[in-house]
Amino acid sequence: AWYTHIPGLVVAVPSTPADNKGLLKAAIRADDPVVYMEHKGLWGIEGEVPDEEVLLPFGRARIARTGGDLTLVSWSATVAVCEQAALTLEAKGISAEVIDLRTLWPWDIDTVVTSVEKTGRLIVAHEAVTVGGFGAEIAATIGTECFSSLKTPIIRLGAPRVPISYAPPLEDAIRVSAESITTAAEAAMA
């Protein structure tokens, strides 16, 4: 969230190999400075990457999965976690739309508003600390823009405000998981 406070700075956060190529090429050619935040957890991910020249526009989200009951908004490595949760929710009869922001600034307000107006529910999931995280900006904006469409309060999922451990089990314990997203989604649907 810190970088989003700097006027004129673009903040790119890819979640797939194809987006990594498209956003990086766009960043190289951009007139504005770009902070390119590549999550180390995505380095081993394999996926289709187009051979042709692809420049992804900043500020345009990707709908990773369509759904009608609730909206899950995320970025970077947490998008895959949201997709896992959406599969679990689907088995329970809950249809979740997953939105990958791709850039935190500018961020695609219109895509998120359109989805929340359709579903009436929003969960924002990210790895950063929930307090002061970019999820709070999304929640505030959508709370204002979609107030009359919301069926439940907006839910923010992130890390607790504690030091991050170097021990993998302790690090995993504070990360947003597919299970925590599923639990929050079920509560939102109740």
Please name every model-derived segment:
Residues 1-30, 189:
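Conserved thiamine diphosphate
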Residues 27, 31-33, 138-142:
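Glycine- and acidic-residue-enriched helix-capping/beta->alpha junction motif
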Residues 40-190:
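Thiamine diphosphate
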